[in-house]
Amino acid sequence: MKIIQEIPEKNIIKLIPENLDDLWHLSNIIQPYNAIYAVTERRTEDKGDKLRADRGTKRKVFLGIKAEKINFHEDFNRLRVSGKIIHAPEDIPIGSYHTIDIEPLLQVSVQKNWKKWDLARLKDAEDSSKKPKVVVVIMDDSEADIFLVREFGIKELASIKSGVSKKLDYKQNEQAKFSYYSDIINSISEFEGKILFAGPGFGKNNIQNYISEKHKDLAPNVVVESANHTGKSGLSEILKSGIIDKIYGEARISKETQIIEKLLEEISKKGLAAYGIESVNNAMNYSAIDTLLLTDEYLRRNRRTIEELMNSVENINGSILIISTEHDAGKQLKALGGISALLRFPIE
């Protein structure tokens, strides 16, 4: 995320989202009644051509809308914000509806009553754009699962079988093994960032040696770590271990996974945790909240009613973490009601 300009007297921040992660961050920052300004396409009638029966022509215009619906479309790499027009050229009626498609590299101005957690999220997005992206390959000698680590979740890129079999002779198995390595490398060769190979056995080490010999351009980006499991279980193990943080700096998804692990541990021993809105509100009555945890879905549904609690947490120097439901840790928090807290001290 690039922050272009801040205009405090108007509560406006001009910014440019650079990738899908930034669009996800924006989907959690923009809320109903915020004003959004951007260059967008709008179909307008050609009043000078009365004979044409079509719906007019599309042209680019600078519009402002008051947000009503905010929809993040991962598959289409866009954030759609719909609402009534509040600023437009003279030939476009104020009060009519329009949808602004926010895509990477589109400059957007957001006008709202900026909260500390909104600004913290913008800073996170700005910082994350400077960090290397990470692909994780969880593998052994028979299968490899390839994942892209994003700010808001994990995308499975490929699952590759090795073809190595006890029914084949040594030469055939060697051919199958190198074909397996080649398929893995073809799946990641265009990726710009760090590549983490992990899993049980020596498969990860063998492919590292193969890359060092055959693909020297990729070799500097390769990191190898141990894991006891393959597949998604191995990925979960890696996320909980903190290994991603060593590569990435501090990966948001890794941080979220670790803090939910801590929450579940505290809940299991009836320790420093509260979950569900009633329990969390009770903890706030004692000023006991250290970290308030919300799923992005819960915040979007309840933002107007939950902001007082969020303000109260910040007033006692507590922290707030909004967790994506696109990965397992967020789904675990959702199962707890979508809202929980880590506490400073136990309460009855």
Swiss-Prot record:
It holds the Pfam family eRF1_3. It is an enzyme of class 3 (hydrolase). GO terms for biological process: nonfunctional rRNA decay; nuclear-transcribed mRNA catabolic process, no-go decay; nuclear-transcribed mRNA catabolic process, non-stop decay; ribosome disassembly; RNA surveillance. Disulfide bonds: none annotated. The N-terminal domain has the RNA-binding Sm fold. It harbors the endoribonuclease activity. PANTHER family: PELOTA (PTHR10853), PROTEIN PELOTA HOMOLOG (PTHR10853:SF0). This is Protein pelota homolog. The lineage of its organism: Archaea, Methanobacteriati, Methanobacteriota, Methanomada group, Methanococci.
